[in-house]
Amino acid sequence: MSIISTQLNAIKPSPTLAVVRKTLELKRAGIDIIALGAGEPDFDTPDNIKEAAIKAIKDGFTKYTNVEGIPALKEAIQAKFKRENNIDYDLEEIIVSTGGKQVIYNLFMASLNKGDEVIIPAPYWVSYPDMVLLAEGTPVFANCGIESNFKLSGEALEQLITPKTKWLIINSPSNPTGASYSHSELKNIAEVLRKHPYVNVMSDDIYEHITFDGFKFYTLAEIAPDLKDRIFTVNGVSKAYSMTGWRIGYGAGSKALIKAMTIIQSQSTSNPCSISQVAAVEALNGVQGYIAQNALNFEKKRDLALSILQRVKYFECYKPEGAFYLFIKCDKIFGAKTKSGKVINNSNDFGEYLLEEAKVAVVPGIAFGLEGYFRISYATSMEELEEACLRMERACGSL
């Protein structure tokens, strides 16, 4: 009898973390690798947030807190939803966890029964399907390629709903594509949901504040307040405030769900880090002006990367409305031979080619559930980004 649970047989290690690990190994070996695989901002946590954390340490705020988060942070989250999204939540409808990932994990563990279906538009964030599988749910994938601007339409959603459907996942702006749902697109989805009262929605808004070209962000509970009790909204401080390592995410939904998720959290991690919670209060309540400036910097990086990569004859590029990724179609290169005679048959092969020939680390599209693409993160310096894109252009030009 194996000591490892059979439930883990269907679960794969994170492919994005695997790319990061491989990149670090090559760098340690002295190879000049430019990594475009990581999904975190390249700026530091603002000083006012750090100072709030230091004060919390000096004040001795280092003990257990409420499992679901300290009142001050839940109040800051409540105010954020009202101020930015025009949504009213009671404090009992809010939970704070150790990152947005734990919020989503707790949500599915609390709500899924064996065989319940979760509709996941592909490409998707790599952890969605595995978290559904761990909760004994069934992922149902909706292929949303570049021809549909990487977004799920109401009409396509209608075709996927069955009596077993329990959740739909919406991630806007999206990882890995940066595609973002407009007001009318969300309204279209809401119209379908009204016909199916047993279908709930998990809205992952973690990239909410990183949008470009004047794009106006909306979240589904804002568009369809009549569906609020069926919508669970996930957010956090990781991306907007560059606090990926602080591990604070939060969610808002029905009191019944929050209560169930709190029970799960109480028997796993207990409360999120007390010091990180104080830092998150300062993030949400403190000055916000730098967020727009950071988004503008990402927009400039997006434009730089596109200006180079659009020249590659094998690539088809989508101009994203947000986040800090490009998800580039590259299937025209399949069948090409490298100088060593190896045939590039899929996105994994192409990722390996770029790593070996261009010394650039990217993430193959198959990791996100859609073959024929690859993802780059442009959350790096302008100089490094330009060099990486030029290397990729040269590497493709030699095929």
Curated annotation (Swiss-Prot):
Please give the biological process terms from Gene Ontology that the record holds. amino acid metabolic process; biosynthetic process
Annotated site residues (Important for prephenate aminotransferase activity) in this chain: K12
Localization recorded for this chain is: Cytoplasm
Q: Which residues carry this modification: N6-(pyridoxal phosphate)lysine?
A: K239
Q: EC number(s) on record?
A: 2.6.1.1, 2.6.1.79
Which GO MF terms does the UniProt record name?
glutamate-prephenate aminotransferase activity; L-aspartate:2-oxoglutarate aminotransferase activity; pyridoxal phosphate binding
Q: Does this entry carry the keyword Kinase?
A: no
* Cofactor(s), by name: pyridoxal 5'-phosphate
- Which species expresses this protein natively? Rickettsia bellii (strain RML369-C)
* Entry keywords, A to Z: Aminotransferase, Cytoplasm, Pyridoxal phosphate, Transferase
What the protein does?
A: Catalyzes the reversible conversion of aspartate and 2-oxoglutarate to glutamate and oxaloacetate. Can also transaminate prephenate in the presence of glutamate.
What this protein is called in its record is Probable aspartate/prephenate aminotransferase
- Where is this chain primarily localised? cytoplasm
A cellular-component GO term for this protein: cytoplasm
Chain positions recorded as L-aspartate binding sites: G39, W125, N175, R375
Chemical reaction(s) catalysed: L-aspartate + 2-oxoglutarate = oxaloacetate + L-glutamate; L-arogenate + 2-oxoglutarate = prephenate + L-glutamate
Question: Gene for this protein?
Answer: aatA
Name the Gene3D superfamilies for this protein. Aspartate Aminotransferase, domain 1 (3.90.1150.10), Type I PLP-dependent aspartate aminotransferase-like (Major domain) (3.40.640.10)
Assembly mode: Homodimer.
